Amino acid sequence: QKHILTGKQLAADYKVLRATLDSIDPSIKIAGVDVAYQIPIVGSLLPTTSEFLEHGGMESIDFLTWHWYAMESKRCPFHGRFAPATQKGAISTSTMDKGNKWANRMNALVKKYQLSVELWMGEMSLVSCGGAVNITDSFAGTFWYLDELAHLAVQGHSVTFRQTLVGSRYGLIEQSSLQPLPDYWGLLLFRSLVGQRVLGIEVHNSQGRFVRAYAFE
């Protein structure tokens, strides 16, 4: 707890980084502040990001970013901060809804501070700390991934980064064989079929959260 970086300190550090990079090449872009909501030991998302913005952090960055993991790996439990990884949880609508809630809160910060900035998802996967066997490396996690890509686009996120391309159990490509994993094919399908413009759409039926529809062109 003694070594947590505060939003105020991060704003000061990013100011130094901005000045350093400007002295080398002013065209270099900076994305930040890259905080995940579940991990208070390294700074909780809303308090840290709010404090960062209050102390002028936005003057030093070009893209406002945050990190998101929907479930918890056995490798590094965070004492109930989020649900343990299971296949049932991977396809649960409540798991899918969580990311939407936090994206809403990040958008609220953008409006509160009247920011004219692109909102990015700087890092995400269904399960934290390397993922989980038979979940993030299987089609069980692909439903969540596709829904996450769609709703983040609807929520105004210009860019979404996956954790990770190759490595552990949440990569898009298997580390030893270099064979594409299910989420790779899901992403390829998404990129092949989905356009760059989000269209407004609503679902009016009794299924509510269980039927999801997104439209792009």
Question: Where are the language model's segments positioned?
Answer:
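Conserved residues at the C-terminal ends of beta-strands
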Residues: 1, 67, 163
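Short, exposed beta-strand "edge-strand" segments with a Pro/Gly-rich flavor and a Y/T-containing core
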Residues: 2-5, 20, 176-179
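Noncatalytic carbohydrate-binding groove/subsite architecture in carbohydrate-active enzymes
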Residues: 5-142, 155
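Aromatic/acidic polysaccharide-binding cleft in carbohydrate-active enzymes
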Residues: 121-212
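Short amphipathic beta-strand and strand-loop transition segments with alternating hydrophobic
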Residues: 213-217
